[in-house]
Swiss-Prot record:
The gene is leuC. This is 3-isopropylmalate dehydratase large subunit. Belongs to the aconitase/IPM isomerase family. LeuC type 2 subfamily. SUPFAM superfamilies: Aconitase iron-sulfur domain. The keyword Metal-binding applies.
Amino acid sequence: MSKPMTMSQKILAYHAGKEYVEPGDLIFANVDLVLGNDVTTPVAIKEFEKIGVDKVFDKDKITIVPDHFTPNKDIKSAQQCKMVREFAKKYDITNYFEVGEMGIEHALLPEKGLVVPGDLVIGADSHTCTYGALGAFSTGIGSTDMACAMATGKCWFKVPEAIKFVLYGKKTGWTSGKDIILHIIGMIGVDGALYKSMEYTGEGLKSLSMDDRFTIANMAIEAGAKNGIFEVDEKTIEYVKQHSTKPYKIFKADEDAEYSEVYEIDISKIRPTVAFPHLPENTKTIDEITEKIYIDQVVIGSCTNGRIEDLRIAAKILKGRKVKKGLRCIIFPATQNIYKQALKEGLIEIFIDAGCVVSTPTCGPCLGGHMGILAEGERALATTNRNFVGRMGHPNSEVYLSSPAIAAASAVLGYIGSPEELGMKGDEE
């Protein structure tokens, strides 16, 4: 009888052709998908060309999404995108997404059905951990590893220890997946899951939409984790059936699998949470913020919170209201499809009427790229995932992190606050 394993151990063992892998083991495994963007792929291309192969291992298993500085913000980014475009054409890469059909990579891939439960996914972007929401093992790598994987279809891994998060209860009020992950990071710290797998289970999952789960898995890296992964349930399967025709495999953790820590969290007690500068662990609930923190800019979007559910919540709050005079509110639908759906539902009109500006899908200001860079002394509230020093612009600017509900309400108030201050009771649905 084989030894008990966690979800992550099982997926890694399966892809390495082994019956069992142990935390700390160094393994080579076959990957199902290799991902790169316009920032990381050019470096990978240079390394790939040094290998001396004349083709990629599988043109269907490589995905390249120019999303960080697109539409091209300057000559340098245009050159990088040109290099990536030419590489995709030369090697006939099936899943290269040009500006007209692109989106922020970590929202686009699940939407396109490119990741399914049981997959082993590597991406030259730290937020590749997002796909754990689908019950896949997905993790960020460097451009050199991307190059090697494009040539061989394999990558090396150190099997991580795991932390088990047993969620119970139901979301209440304006609490969302973003608040849950900010609460967890505030609890364990930015190195609380260092090189570990964050594995989510428990009856509380029923209360979490797929968009909530993508948000939670997305920010595993902000706790230092190797990956975040959710137990597959009916919601996962329903999502996969709607978006993909790929075969999938469900890996459930063994009952007696070993974890370095186990946390039980009652999500019904989690309140909307804000991360203060300059780390995602510097959290306070909205009730603990006693002073008025005035802001210059609100950003709603990103690979963390740019999905349709996020936009619906923001629109619900902004409908019939105006963004505070002198404040900038920028909204980024995460993909073209999400943008189109938001148009159909009238959300874009609500945003524009409220005084927001709506951008094409791009990572934009999240990494200090473009479309909303902060000046010296400016302060932003964003639904993004990082608030390090200088993350969104000038080293002397500040970024606070929140959910779309808090961000939208704050855009109206002019300071960090809750929809409750606008007389809106929480959504119990």
